[in-house]
Structures are given as C-alpha cells and as structure tokens.
Amino acid sequence: GKVKDDKPAPPKRPLSAFFLFKQHNYDQVKKENPNAKITELTSMIAEKWKHVTEKEKKKYEGLQQEAKAKYEKDMQAYEKKYGKPEKVKKIKKSKKGSK
C-alpha cells in the first residue's frame, strides 16, 4: 500500500479577483434567482463582473494581491518546514481518434 506521510497539505492557491467577486455576490444572485442552476448563476455573476466599475474591480484585485502575498508567505514557511510539495500530475485521458 501507499505510505501516507504526516505532512499537511500545502497552502491553497489564492483565488482570482473574479472568484472573490463571485463569492461575494453569489448569495445575493442566488436569492434573486432561486431556481437558477449553478452554471446559470455563474454566468449571471460573470455578466455583472463585466459591468463592474474600475474602482470596484481594483477592490477585488487588491484582495487578490493580499491573498497572493499571504499564499507566498505561507508557501515559503511550508517549504522551509516540509520541502517543496509534490506536484500532483493530472492524468489526461487519451482520446483515440477515429478516422
């Protein structure tokens, strides 16, 4: 079997400005559209994001920068203590082309 080490998971990557905006607006959009699917809600939020003022976008970009700085600091501390985290390889499913 695979030996599980006691290393904690490395810090999670910071969210993008759009994802922070999405998190911030999701409940409100859901409340306004209770029967919408998640994909529809995401589209609505994306549409809102397109029309957000530069000032508002800067707010989320600032939050993203803070999250990124924290992530980098946490990652340095993690690497100092545990070494670089192993990259998880994504397995690509090969599609057999039929010609």
Curated annotation (Swiss-Prot):
InterPro entries named among the record's database cross-references: HMG_box_dom, HMG_box_dom_sf, HMGB
GO molecular-function term, one example from the UniProt record: DNA binding
Record SUPFAM superfamilies: HMG-box
GO cellular component term, pick one: nucleus
PROSITE patterns in the record: HMG_BOX_2 (PS50118)
Residues of the DNA-binding region: 11-79
Key word Zinc-finger present: no
Positions bearing Phosphoserine: S16, S43
Listed name of the protein: High mobility group protein
Compartments where found: Nucleus; Chromosome
